[in-house]
Amino acid sequence: MLRLSDATYLVRDHDEAITFFVDALGFALREDETNASGRRRVVVGPADGGTGLVLALTDAADAVGNQAAGSVAFFLETDDFAAQHARMTAAGVRFSEEPRHEVYGTVAVFEDLYGMPWDLIQPPALG
């Protein structure tokens, strides 16, 4: 069995990224360790499991917020779109569009702390 455990997410600052992911998106801080050489490893992800994001510092400032060249790179799936949308909006997350209904579910695009677009999506009920 294979599963994607983590993906790299480029950041300018670990602490500002932790604040966004934990406070605004409701993620858990899964790991925050500094090794003997001084390199810090930070991993955040949904509290109930799934793929984590390794928050990686980079000197390539133009890459931060542009990891997918302006396209949506990450998709947050929820089973209660209205509640998550309201919670995220109250936490200061900026949605760039109103929620819309598509054949693949209810979706709205939001921007992360660096302006990169993400989807919040609730798939249609199966049945």
Question: Where does each model-flagged region fall?
Answer:
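Vicinal oxygen chelate
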Residues: 1-6, 28-77, 83-113, 120-127
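Conserved beta-strand-loop-alpha-helix junction that forms the acyl-donor binding cleft
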Residues: 11-14, 36
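Residues in soluble alpha-helical coiled-coils and helical-bundle/repeat scaffolds
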Residues: 9-12, 79
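Conserved active-site tyrosine of GNAT-family acetyltransferases
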Residues: 17-22, 88, 115
